[in-house]
């Protein structure tokens, strides 16, 4: 293409994404848009088309972002190229959202006509505003009996401050209002700015690994043009490659000769090493490089850490390969090798939150067929010693001796919880139980309130989300951001089985709730650990002090079965002999800890 053709084509490109809270109908709307623009033959259409991961379809949530190119003939008779970038809505996957928004000029904000604005709707809107996107409100599910579009329209204006007078009323399920949405995109979303003659700048917003073609980068071209055969350089790593193919997704991958300004597509350059392409990096030409990289999005720091160990220790290297491949298109995952006396070799992994941790775990088990044992999640603590040293602890077993500690600080988050009036009491109770400090309470309208609390991150990590959902019948929604570290009275609790410490069961707990936690865990382990041939004491200890103890009784054979009646001293002899044998066994026996026992430390639902 020459310069004029490129400029004309550029003016017809519209890049947009869809943002919404979980379950407000985002993936269904994406399906309808694909249908309306005839992206696929009718027989290829299936629900949640862009959710390509088996896990996403099963849980009904979007985890990874996805990009597709569509053509749409608008009412003005012109043909437009639309790039739809689908995003997840769950709080753990906000970074996926910020990545896709960085590649767009506009966003469709989907709000449920019955439920109105939720916490993550707001969080995603703020991300979109940070990226200066044109936001088009769409009120979805207007065919529901409980829908109240006028109230929601008012809410969008009051809470977010967007003009919602032209908000499209739609029902993705019934296919109502889809054309109006497409017309609004063409009309209101600006065309990409950028110059196809400038030095090349492409932003990598995702990537995946193909065993035959190497790493495939998902890119958005900001300036310049990239063709097959070009020598390109990754600006962060300085590595150079020759482009072997470029193309777009029309959900299926379709090869093209070149990608130019505004295009969203993929680039393969037989990149074999997973670490050479970092998400957020800028690709430029090797011969005529851009002066500076694009402003990437910030590197996310993991908040929650846990150990992952293969059940079969021979698969340690397979687990490393699996983590490397997942890390490639999940920039928020971090891992490093660690060893445990109880579990052998494995990895300490960092995640954004509990859902993120569960998903990664499930993906490893499914996609790579590796059975895992996971240890209790913990957060990063700052430990200050009496001799003036300070260091960071992300694994409870690295906690120093309590006598040497001056103070321990833990991360706190500011949690914004949106909840209907009737459940305010229940939510406050949960937050106080989690050592939360009340900050603020604001009414959104007559029926809904936003509560703001400061809560230690370690309390949210356990089962805060589950408790919140179950005590508010699923109506509460919540979003959190890290605000920094504060000192807390924290102690490390160790679990001893048969007088031996099991390092993988240690956890850090607040001194006030240590006794209760210890008691619950000891009782749980007593139920979960199978009986042995000898009796096994279970102890929860802080330093040298035993906080709670219980004993798993030994299994024993009835050695008196052969004695009919007979002399008591004969029976005594047999019983004493058995006792002696059990004692010997106890001194050499080791206790197998089942996976459920490690999970019990996580799920503290009994207290």
From Swiss-Prot:
Residues 11-193 form the tr-type G domain. Keywords: Cell membrane, GTP-binding, Hydrolase, Membrane, Nucleotide-binding, Protein biosynthesis. PROSITE patterns: G_TR_1, G_TR_2. It comes from the Bacteria. Transmembrane segments: none annotated. The keyword Ribonucleoprotein does not apply. It is an enzyme of class 3 (hydrolase). GTP binds at residues 23-28, 140-143. Coiled coil: none annotated. Signal peptide: none annotated. It holds the Pfam family GTP_EFTU. One of its GO terms (biological process) is positive regulation of translation. This is Elongation factor 4. It comes from Bacillus mycoides (strain KBAB4) (Bacillus weihenstephanensis). The lineage of its organism: Bacteria, Bacillati, Bacillota, Bacilli, Bacillales.
């Amino acid at each position: 293409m020459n310069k004029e053709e490129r400029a004309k084509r550029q003016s017809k490109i519209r890049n947009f994404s869809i943002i919404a809270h979980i379950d407000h109908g985002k993936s269904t709307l994406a399906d309808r848009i694909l249908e309306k623009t005839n992206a696929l033959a009718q027989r290829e259409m299936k629900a949640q088309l862009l959710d390509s991961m088996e896990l996403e379809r099963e849980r009904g949530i979007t985890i990874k972002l996805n990009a597709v190119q569509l053509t749409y003939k608008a009412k003005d008779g012109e043909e437009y190229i639309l790039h739809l970038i689908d995003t997840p809505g769950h709080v753990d996957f906000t970074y996926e959202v910020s990545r896709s928004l960085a590649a767009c000029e506009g966003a469709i904000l989907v709000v449920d006509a019955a439920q109105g604005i939720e916490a993550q709707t707001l969080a995603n809107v703020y991300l979109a505003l940070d990226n200066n996107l044109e936001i088009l409100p769409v009120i979805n599910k207007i065919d529901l009996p409980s829908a109240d579009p006028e109230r929601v329209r008012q809410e969008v204006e009051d809470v977010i401050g967007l003009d919602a007078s032209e908000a499209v009323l739609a029902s993705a399920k019934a296919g109502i209002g889809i054309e109006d949405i497409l017309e609004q995109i063409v009309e209101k979303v600006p065309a990409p700015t950028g110059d196809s003659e400038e030095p090349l700048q492409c932003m990598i917003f995702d990537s995946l690994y193909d065993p035959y073609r190497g790493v495939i980068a998902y890119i958005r071209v900001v300036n310049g043009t990239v063709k097959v055969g070009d020598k390109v350089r990754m600006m962060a790593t300085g590595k150079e490659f020759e482009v072997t193919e470029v193309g777009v997704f029309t959900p299926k991958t379709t090869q093209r000769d070149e990608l130019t300004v505004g295009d969203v597509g993929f680039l393969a350059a037989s990149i074999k090493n997973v670490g050479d392409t970092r998400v957020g990096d800028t690709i430029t030409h090797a011969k005529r490089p851009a002066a500076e990289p694009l402003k990437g999005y910030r590197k996310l720091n993991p908040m929650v850490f846990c150990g992952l160990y293969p059940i079969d220790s021979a698969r340690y290297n397979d687990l490393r390969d699996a983590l490397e491949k997942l890390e490639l298109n999940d920039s928020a995952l971090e891992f490093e090798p660690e060893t445990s006396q109880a579990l052998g070799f494995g990895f300490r992994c960092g995640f954004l939150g509990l859902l993120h941790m569960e998903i990664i775990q499930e993906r490893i088990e499914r996609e790579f067929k590796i059975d895992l044992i996971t240890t209790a999640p913990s957060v990063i603590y700052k430990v200050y010693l009496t001799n003036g040293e300070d260091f960071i602890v992300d694994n409870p077993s690295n906690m120093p001796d309590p006598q040497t500690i001056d103070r321990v600080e833990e991360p706190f988050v500011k949690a914004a919880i949106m909840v209907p009036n009737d459940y305010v009491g229940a939510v406050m109770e949960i937050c106080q139980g989690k050592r939360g400090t009340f900050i603020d309470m604001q009414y959104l309208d007559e029926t809904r309130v936003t509560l703001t609390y400061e809560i230690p991150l370690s309390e949210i990590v356990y089962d805060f989300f589950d408790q919140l959902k179950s005590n508010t019948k699923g109506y509460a929604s919540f979003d959190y951001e890290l605000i920094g570290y504060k000192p807390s009275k924290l102690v490390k609790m160790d679990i001893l089985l048969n007088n031996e410490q099991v390092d993988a069961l240690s956890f850090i707990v607040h001194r006030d709730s240590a006794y209760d936690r210890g008691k619950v865990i000891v009782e749980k382990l007593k139920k979960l650990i199978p009986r042995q041939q000898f009796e096994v004491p279970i102890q929860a200890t802080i330093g040298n002090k035993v906080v709670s103890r219980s004993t798993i009784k030994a299994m024993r054979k009835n050695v008196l079965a052969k004695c009919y009646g007979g002399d008591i001293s004969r029976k005594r002899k047999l019983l004493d002999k058995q006792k002696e044998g059990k004692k010997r066994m106890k001194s050499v026996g080791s206790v197998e800890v089942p996976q459920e026992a490690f999970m019990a430390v996580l799920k503290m639902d009994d207290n």
